[in-house]
């Protein structure tokens, strides 16, 4: 089952800040997280039931380090639409 430790961070980019005005929060998680798992974590730890969840899988970038090729970790990104007047900032985990 999914756990709160699978959530890496809430993303604060230009695009995600524009989406927050529409009630959408962008969450970065480990690749094994699923929509139903994220929904259960949000309900258990934050007390929030999302209206909808969209997900996409992001491959880690290939980078050079000391002349060798390496790869950053893969992750999943979730776009979570929250009910009106609810945000994850005013809830305590």
Swiss-Prot record:
A single GO cellular-component term on record: ribonucleoprotein complex
UniProt GO molecular function: rRNA binding; structural constituent of ribosome
Gene3D superfamilies found in the cross-reference section: 3.30.70.330
Keyword field contains rRNA-binding: yes
TM stretches of this protein: none
Alphabetized UniProt keyword annotations: Ribonucleoprotein, Ribosomal protein, RNA-binding, rRNA-binding
InterPro entries noted in UniProt: Nucleotide-bd_a/b_plait_sf, Ribosomal_uL23-like, Ribosomal_uL23/eL15/eS24_sf
Pfam families: Ribosomal_L23
GO biological process: translation
Recorded family membership: Belongs to the universal ribosomal protein uL23 family.
Biological function: One of the early assembly proteins it binds 23S rRNA. One of the proteins that surrounds the polypeptide exit tunnel on the outside of the ribosome. Forms the main docking site for trigger factor binding to the ribosome.
Subunit structure: Part of the 50S ribosomal subunit. Contacts protein L29, and trigger factor when it is bound to the ribosome.
Protein name: Large ribosomal subunit protein uL23
Source organism of the structure: Campylobacter jejuni subsp. jejuni serotype O:23/36 (strain 81-176)
């Amino acid at each position: 089952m999914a756990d709160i430790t699978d959530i890496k961070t809430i993303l604060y980019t230009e695009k995600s800040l524009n989406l927050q005005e529409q009630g959408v929060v962008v969450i970065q998680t480990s690749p094994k997280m699923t929509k139903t798992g994220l929904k259960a974590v949000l309900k258990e730890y934050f007390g929030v039931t999302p209206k909808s969840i969209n997900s996409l899988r992001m491959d880690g970038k290939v980078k050079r380090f000391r002349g060798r090729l390496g790869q950053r970790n893969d992750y999943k990104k979730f776009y979570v639409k929250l009910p009106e007047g609810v945000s994850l900032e005013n809830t305590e985990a």
